[in-house]
Curated annotation (Swiss-Prot):
Gene3D superfamilies the record matches: von Willebrand factor, type A domain
Biased composition (Basic and acidic residues): 80-97
Superkingdom: Bacteria
Pfam families to which the protein is assigned, alphabetical: DUF444
Protein name: UPF0229 protein CKL_0641
Family according to the record: Belongs to the UPF0229 family.
Positions of the UniProt region annotated as Disordered: 71-109
Source species of the chain: Clostridium kluyveri (strain ATCC 8527 / DSM 555 / NBRC 12016 / NCIMB 10680 / K1)
Residues forming coiled coils: none
Amino acid sequence: MAIFREFDVNDHHDRSLEDRRRHRQLVEKSIKDNLADIISEESIIGQSKNKKVKIPIKGIKEYQFIYGDNSSGVGSGDGSQKKGDRIGKAIKDRDGKGNQGAGNQEGEDMYEIEVTIEDVLDYLMEDLELPLMDKKKFSQILSNNSPKKSGYQRKGINPRLAKKRTVVEKLKRQQGTKRALREIHGELESDPKNKLPENTTIKSRFPFKQDDLRYFRVKRKPKLELNAAIICVMDTSGSMDSTRKFLARSFFFVLYRFIKMKYNNVEVKFISHSTSAKVVTENEFFHKVESGGTYISSGLKKALEVIEENYNPAYWNVYTFYVSDGDNWSEDNSLALKCAKDLCKVCNLFSYAEIIPSPYGSSIKHIFQNKITDNNFTVVTIHEKQDLWKSLKKILNKELEER
């Protein structure tokens, strides 16, 4: 991108713009590096979007020369090295990071900043949306994420710089200046007394100035989207231990916050089940603890009942997300499979996330994968908290990957 330097010393230019841009880049990188810890932090589950979390961020150091240790010897390779490899690297003193023990080297400057949950999701999920959404009758959902360009303005940020318009403004100023110079030159020729000195030169370079810059004016217009209903089903049986339930709630919490942030008026229903299923409130879903056996069919059957009673597939885009450890009463597997197939028929997307599959017996995931061939069915496996973000990205991609 072209760099426009300030020539007018009297103009008040925002010199902190580059610092803010670099700070935002550091925040984005830090969020991505610490994502697993942020979205799986137990204290944020069920909290409002304004709940703040702390993330570490590296300080920005000025460039400086760093001298070597003047060690003797010459580094050499055997010909198999690639660009970027370090040859003849000596063993350095430890810096005390991680499990290395006490070190004797200077560490990095780290700072902690506070960001809200909404900011974290905004950084990460701006390119994600509910997949496979179709047009239905009586569209009602308003989406906030629909910025539109609306003319130009003199002030703005670099990403919104209108390059063509900026060049046009410069050319207009350049042509006006040339026209004025021709008029002055004609007056000088007509009157010999007003001739320029012999050593006078006219500069041919015509640089950009701050007054030439034009930026796109962006307005956010509410965009009418499509009817959507989200059904969240979670296994709360005894086989779902505290770790599994924690990962399941983390998965649903980030999913729920994404939906509430991205779409207005989306309807969300929460279902929890063991051997029987029931519709619960948001607070009960994220905080209530249950136990008992497992009938997966009970949760899926309850989802079908909710869809039949409230969300006609002819008018609604329905998305069902089910999370379990895959451990099911064997006699219930056939009924659970039938309910899963029925959900694929009435839903735009039926997604199953398996949390730390049980080492005992066969998992329901293998039955679903072998018996369900619908393109709107997707399966993810979550073994640890680092898998949460990858699983959500796979589910919320604009187009499902081919099976």
